Amino acid sequence: MELITKEESKTNYEYGCDPYNRPIGELLKNGIVVIDKPSGPTSHEVSAWVRDILKLKLAGHGGTLDPKVTGVLPVALENTSKCISVWHMIPKEYVCLMHLHRDTEEEELLKIFKKFTGRIFQRPPLKAAVKRSLRIRKIYELELLEKDGRDVLFRVRCQSGTYIRTLAEDMGEALGTSAHMQELRRIVSGPFTEKDIVYLQDLTDAYIFWKENGDETELRKIIKPMEYGLQHINKIIVKDSAVDAICHGANVYLNGVSKLSKGIGADETVLIETLKGEAIGIGTALLNTKNVLKESKNEEDNREKYKEPIVDIERIFMSPNTYPKMWKKKK
């Protein structure tokens, strides 16, 4: 992600911390564990097991997987649960084993894959926990991996909220027959991939080893900082002097900005970070990158507009007083 410097600024290492060097106690409360969800338990049960293994008060999952579905399940630990809403709308990727109910040529199958790539209509299945109204979902990629008789293995990258079971059934109908999903595995969920996953037993062993031997090496390999799960979002990096004000609920103003992502659009959700890379919170950008830089050049000529916020803060991750107070209350 390319960053543009608005104003060079240095950070003071007497407060705050590089996210990847947080003390293990802080990491446990501001971290993410990406579990390889087994077939059988619900996503909620897996999250509860992670919470209990790590002796935490709270753990929540991002992107529910049905009990029989396996694969990438990001679990947010305590304070990181505030990030879950950001994960809900990110694209997902699956590998699905579909069984067709009649013989089909590979060429015919590829034509259907092409037809179902792009915007499609879906109605949630009967067992879905949402209203069964017709909705539009986007299929970004459909790739045939293997075909053995009537069994078809394919990879799909899709918009969040896409029902793969329904997709398989609809493709079968388009082929002039019927089809059903036999197995499903999630391999990507936004920034999380199969390279990040661990088994519940590995997590248990690493935690026990830390508690009994004081060695946190393996536990650190498993628990990722909160910021790892926010790397897909465009960001605005603020000066140390602006951090505590934002932690107390202030919006982001132009004079507090040091750097920002190149491609920020107006009304886009953006991450607010410190110069050390710590997540402060998220908000809605009120100006795009081009206009932020334009306002910076004109700040002397346009003081009134300069006083307007450029980001409307929606959710704060960082605790107040992590950085010293460097702001004054209006009289």
From Swiss-Prot:
Catalytic positions are D66
Claim: tRNA processing is one of the keywords in the record: yes
Q: Give the enzyme's main class according to its UniProt record, as a single word.
A: isomerase
Reaction equations catalysed: uridine(55) in tRNA = pseudouridine(55) in tRNA
Name a Pfam family for this protein. TruB_N
Location of the PUA domain? 233-307
Q: Which family does it belong to?
A: Belongs to the pseudouridine synthase TruB family. Type 2 subfamily.
**Protein's UniProt name:** Probable tRNA pseudouridine synthase B
Species per Swiss-Prot/TrEMBL record: Methanococcus aeolicus (strain ATCC BAA-1280 / DSM 17508 / OCM 812 / Nankai-3)
Source organism lineage? Archaea, Methanobacteriati, Methanobacteriota, Methanomada group, Methanococci
